[in-house]
């Protein structure tokens, strides 16, 4: 009989991840990569729809570009942090912007991690897994 702990482990492998990027090709590539690793995905193409979708879907993790129309990534991070319902969602910034200055600003604004495009697929997946485990009720004690 499954326990609460094993149910939680199983749910992490099917966790819903929200992709926020204005590039449709990148959204599709990330969606395919994440689904191949048993994650569910939803996506938004701008800052305004990102907040609305996060409120509706309650993803377990958000992958966020900084250069977005209708509200840049920093404004999205700020709004997520200001929301009691959304502030605990880990956010991984994935952007074409230079790390110098942007990485520190992103982390200070509440991001969990920062990647410059193109990101290493394996490293990104590793950070996604670690972020989901840290955000789970069981913390880092979950098996990988």
Predicted features along the sequence, with ranges:
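The feature encodes the CheY-like receiver
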Residues: 27, 69, 87, 99
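Active-site beta3 strand of CheY-like receiver
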Residues: 57-63, 68
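Alpha4 helix (beta4-alpha4-beta5 surface) of REC/receiver domains from two-component response regulators
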Residues: 75, 98-115, 122-126
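Acidic catalytic/metal-coordinating carboxylates
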Residues: 46-49, 60, 72-78
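Non-catalytic signal-transmission and effector/linker regions of two-component phosphorelay proteins
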Residues: 1-16, 122-144
């Amino acid at each position: 009989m499954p326990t609460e702990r094993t149910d939680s482990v199983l749910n992490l492998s099917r966790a819903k991840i929200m992709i926020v990027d204005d590039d449709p090709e990148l959204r599709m590539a990330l969606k395919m990569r994440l689904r191949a690793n048993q994650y569910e995905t939803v996506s938004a193409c701008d800052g305004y729809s990102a907040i609305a979708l996060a409120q509706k879907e309650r993803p377990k993790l958000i992958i966020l570009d900084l250069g977005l129309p209708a509200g840049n990534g920093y404004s999205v991070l700020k709004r997520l942090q200001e929301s009691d319902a959304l502030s605990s969602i880990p956010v991984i910034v994935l952007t074409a912007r230079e790390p110098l200055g942007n990485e520190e600003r992103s982390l200070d604004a509440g991001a969990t991690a920062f990647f410059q495009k193109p990101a290493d697929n394996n490293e990104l997946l590793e950070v996604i897994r670690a972020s989901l485990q840290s955000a789970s009720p069981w913390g880092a004690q979950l098996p990988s």
